[in-house]
Amino acid sequence: MPYGDVATSSYGKRRHLVLRQRRYLVLRQAPSLCRTGSVTGHDTIDYVLDIGYSLSRRFPDPPQTDYRRAGVRDLRHDLFCGDVYLADTKADREVSTAWGWVPVLDFAWALCDIVEQLDQDPRGSRSAKPQFAELDFTESTDRMLFERRFGWVDIAADWMPVEEPPITFSHRLLRREARDFLHDLIADLTDMHDGLADNPAIWDLQARFPRLPS
């Protein structure tokens, strides 16, 4: 993302607007401004997850968009383009995009769906059988890859260097943070776009993936 695009990250319940520079699609240092959550128990290591996004000025929403009446397809594929990242802030590593055209609401929506897909085994965190899911990007052949074993989820991407290990979080943490990210993102977008808060698709989305207790 070229310097000057607006990136949004959260810390606690506060939201910040910061200027960031993203030139390459890489696994890189995680940002210092972040919303965090942590659990302990995987080899006694604390894993701290931050999910964030930026909106790109290169791919603005179509003029005269009626956000109140926008359909699911428009909300997921045509609006709110930018970039996203998932970061392990303790290890200072993240999986991020840098295209500028990723529909960030669609990413948040799909991430919540994927977390549920990874929880189909009735044995839950006792299951040693791996469970897989992919997040596809519509304008690219690249994918973000998710693999769950027991209660832990490895996250990698096609564009990561082959020698780089995935970032890893507990499934419980990923579920909670994905939903927090979705609700924080919706709050940001409804602040920026008149009528979006009255869109029935947004109501349904919030009801489908409510926030979870810490």
Region roles according to the model:
Residues 159-214:
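Mixed-charge, glycine-accented linear interaction segment located at domain edges/termini
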Residues 97-129, 133-136:
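Compact, well-ordered interaction domains used in eukaryotic information-processing assemblies
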